[in-house]
Every structure is written in C-alpha cells, then in structure tokens.
Amino acid sequence: MNIIRPAALVFILFSIAEPAWAIETLGYETVEEFNGIEIRRYDEHLLASVTVSGGFKTASNSAFRPLFNFISGDNADATKIAMTAPVLQSPDTPANSWIVSFVMPSGFDLATIPAPTSEIVSLTAQPETTMAVIVYRGGWSRRLYQEHESELYDALASTSYAPCGDALWARHNPPITPSFWRKNEILISVCPTTSEL
C-alpha cells in the first residue's frame, strides 16, 4: 500500500488548486524597487465595499457575505460578477471600524456595473494611484500586518516618497490556502516630498 507523506499531499493539493485561483488581479506598473519594497502605479479601478465594526480578523468575515452576495447576483441586474484579487481592508472612523473591498473586474465602471441590492454595499471609482507596497507570506494576524506596516514606513523614511493615505491590507488567496503560502501585501498611497515638487 502506497502512503503519501503529508508534505507531498499538501504540495499535490496546492498544485491542483493554484490554477483554479488564476483570476484577474488589480493591474499596476512597477515604477521603482528599493529597500525591499516597490513603488507601483495602479490602474484606475472600481471597488465594491462594506464598512463593518469589529476586530482586525473578524472584519473580513463580517463583510464577506454581503460582498459575495453582490457579485453572485444580488444586484439590480441579477448579474454574476467574477471574483478578483486582492481583497482589500483599511481602517475607518470611528475606531475599530474597517472598510473591506472587492476589486471589480476591469471591464466595469460606474456606468456599467449593476447597482447593489443591499444598502450596505457601496461602489466607488478609484483613480490611478501611486503606492508603496511590501509583499509578505504568512497568516492573517494583526501582528504580522503591523510588523510589515512598520517595515514599509521605515523603508520610505529616507526616500523622496511620503505617505499620504491610510495603509491598505491586500490578501490574494482564499482562506483554504495554507498560511505559509498566502500572499499578502500592505499598500500606502505616496506623494513626492516637498523637495521633489
């Protein structure tokens, strides 16, 4: 009887699952790389968002259902909308509130996207934006997020780029992905420093 070692089984499952997750991702151009981070110019895009209260990890769970329902046909046209990556999360006011967003496929704009049926789902158009980005692998803990957020701010401190917005947390993989394979990013909008203007 052949016995497949656990590590080999995980590799096989990942190899099978990975092509199924080959979905559209938010488009960007890499402008510069330094200090372990990237400066990217992101294409204009459309977000479907829900604002929720709760902890860092529970916010995405609370927001997932209304967002998933929206792309599954809970909209004015009963149209199914393709899932994309990444899923974005950012802080909101008051404290302990979060905005969780699905990126809409690039073929949609505010004129063509079907209106949400749920009042808690909002649609916003995002302009082309320059962002500093750090990529890391690992679980979805707040500790890892804060460690890499600090690393990103430190990397920007001595450059010609200044943060000019809140940090976004971007997750690229479904929850079934083993934590050590999960691709995560932290993104911060950046502007030229005064000396560069």
Regions found by a protein language model. Name each.
Residues 2-4, 13-197:
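A solvent-exposed interaction/effector surface
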